[in-house]
């Protein structure tokens, strides 16, 4: 059953602050196989004009996808989580994520489409630091696969 289009534009409360730590950045860079020293060496980061190490571009996926869970778990929307897969991801940065940042995410349903019986929901996650400054916008595409005919 197609999702209700009236949910387009609905925003959810900001998440609790997520504190970005050097160790989390290092672990993420290691996990994705990116040896760039700007992610692990404060001196390398400072040489490029950053106050501390910065995170790889996809690092924020962990917090924006978790925040998109507010949409998935909204009982009024009626999205069947057991059928949801991640379809696509885009990021638009104002500045890099840095060690020491305390980030919040505000999720908004950007669009709802029905394609071949699948529900496709785009969720915009606006990421801000503790001072309220914009850091990155993440667009997460969620696909709820059509129910199998029995």
From Swiss-Prot:
Gene3D superfamilies: Hotdog Thioesterase. InterPro entries: FAS1-like_DH_region (IPR039569), HadA-like (IPR016709), HotDog_dom_sf (IPR029069), UPF0336/Enoyl-CoA_hydratase (IPR050965). One of its GO terms (molecular function) is (3R)-hydroxyacyl-[acyl-carrier-protein] dehydratase activity. Residues 8-126 form the MaoC-like domain. It comes from the Bacteria. It holds the Pfam family FAS1_DH_region. SUPFAM superfamilies: Thioesterase/thiol ester dehydrase-isomerase. GO terms for biological process: fatty acid biosynthetic process. PANTHER family: HYDROXYACYL-THIOESTER DEHYDRATASE TYPE 2, MITOCHONDRIAL (PTHR43437:SF3), HYDROXYACYL-THIOESTER DEHYDRATASE TYPE 2, MITOCHONDRIAL-RELATED (PTHR43437). HAMAP family: UPF0336. Belongs to the UPF0336 family. This is UPF0336 protein SAV_4901. It comes from Streptomyces avermitilis (strain ATCC 31267 / DSM 46492 / JCM 5070 / NBRC 14893 / NCIMB 12804 / NRRL 8165 / MA-4680).
């Amino acid at each position: 059953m197609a999702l209700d289009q009236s949910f387009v534009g609905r925003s959810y409360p900001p998440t609790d602050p997520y504190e970005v730590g050097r160790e989390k950045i290092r672990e993420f860079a290691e996990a994705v196989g990116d040896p760039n020293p700007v992610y692990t060496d404060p001196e390398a980061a400072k040489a490029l004009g950053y106050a501390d190490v910065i995170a790889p571009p996809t690092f924020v996926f962990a917090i924006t996808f978790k925040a998109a869970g507010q949409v998935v778990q909204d009982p009024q929307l009626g999205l069947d989580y057991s059928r949801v897969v991640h379809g696509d991801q885009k990021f638009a940065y104002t500045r890099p994520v840095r060690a020491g940042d305390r980030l919040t995410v505000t999720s908004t349903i950007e669009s709802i489409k029905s394609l071949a019986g699948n529900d496709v929901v785009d969720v915009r996650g606006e990421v801000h630091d503790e001072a309220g400054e914009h850091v990155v916008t993440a667009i997460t595409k969620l696909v709820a696969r059509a129910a199998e005919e029995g």
